[in-house]
Amino acid sequence: MMSEPVRVAITGGSGRMGRTLIEAARQQPSILLGAAIERAGSTLIGVDAGELAGVGAMNVAITDSLDKVVDDFDILIDFTSPEASIVHTDWCARNGKAIVIGTTGFNHAQKEQISAYSESTPIVMAPNMAVGVNLMWKLLEVAAKVMGDYTDIEIIEGHHRYKKDAPSGTALKMGEVIAEALGRDLEKCAEYGREGITGERDRETIGFSTIRAGDLVGEHTAMFADIGERIEITHKASSRMTFANGAMRAASWLAEEDPGLYDMQQVLGLN
């Protein structure tokens, strides 16, 4: 017997990612779009979310308030900004809703706030919802343990010209995975870009390089380079749909979970 679909709401419904999330919800029979939210004052308030996303009417009008749709969904999917995500997570904690957070760029204090909310609220938070990226993190752990102490490690990432944070949350997570596997502290060994006369490279460092150009959806490479050979582990996303589908998968999984702070590794059973 088929279970009831998971009712979701999507914040930032008119944005590029918001429209992709609406499209993904439309495509998946296990998901039911219950609400789509935009900021107050938007000219799109009242527009059908499905028509906005180009997938046909879904009988869900864009609204400017979570309070107005509190009875229409069980899980909020949030790809907005760190400040907005904190507000939305607080609302979910007060109203008995779970939340999937795909926002990046949180500072340490904001991460601590979300962790505190998870004591009473089921939360999946991941800097990248793509299944392939989460598999890549597992491969990086293996590569770091085998080669990390004997190679120079560089992380190169590229995104579209509109992305606001750098390095990307995915790139930072790559660094965290590698550093943890090697017993290093990323805050102490990360090197963000180079300029001028830098001297010989310190093998203990993990380098980060950032590209912002055109309409790149997301490209990430970790390089383990020695004299005479190197290994590169790369993930390239060609569509935001890969992130949206991962978010829907996370929502379906989270519907059965108790309060806590989870990541996509747990959603996918990779831990």
UniProtKB/Swiss-Prot annotation:
List UniProt keywords, sorted A-Z: Amino-acid biosynthesis, Cytoplasm, Diaminopimelate biosynthesis, Lysine biosynthesis, NAD, NADP, Oxidoreductase
What is the enzyme's main class? oxidoreductase
Active site per UniProt? H159, K163
Q: In which pathway does it act?
A: Amino-acid biosynthesis; L-lysine biosynthesis via DAP pathway; (S)-tetrahydrodipicolinate from L-aspartate: step 4/4
Q: Which reaction equations make up its catalytic activity?
A: (S)-2,3,4,5-tetrahydrodipicolinate + NAD(+) + H2O = (2S,4S)-4-hydroxy-2,3,4,5-tetrahydrodipicolinate + NADH + H(+); (S)-2,3,4,5-tetrahydrodipicolinate + NADP(+) + H2O = (2S,4S)-4-hydroxy-2,3,4,5-tetrahydrodipicolinate + NADPH + H(+)
Query: EC number(s) for this protein?
Result: 1.17.1.8
Q: Name one GO biological process term.
A: diaminopimelate biosynthetic process
From the Swiss-Prot or TrEMBL record, state where the protein is found: Cytoplasm
CDD domains of this UniProt entry? DHDPR_N (cd02274)
User: Which GO cellular component terms, listed alphabetically, does the Swiss-Prot or TrEMBL entry include?
Assistant: cytosol
Q: Which InterPro entries does this chain map to? A: DapB_C, DapB_N, DapB_N_CS, DHDPR_bac, NAD(P)-bd_dom_sf
Q: Name one GO molecular function term.
A: 4-hydroxy-tetrahydrodipicolinate reductase
Under the heading Pfam families, the entry gives:
DapB_C, DapB_N
List ligand-binding residues for NAD(+): G12, G13, S14, G15, R16, M17, E38, G102, T103, T104, A126, P127, N128, M129
Q: Where does NADP(+) bind?
A: R39
In which residues is (S)-2,3,4,5-tetrahydrodipicolinate bound? Answer: H160, G169, T170
What family is this protein classified in? Belongs to the DapB family.
Physiological role: Catalyzes the conversion of 4-hydroxy-tetrahydrodipicolinate (HTPA) to tetrahydrodipicolinate.
Q: What is this protein called?
A: 4-hydroxy-tetrahydrodipicolinate reductase
Q: Which organism is it from?
A: Shewanella sediminis (strain HAW-EB3)
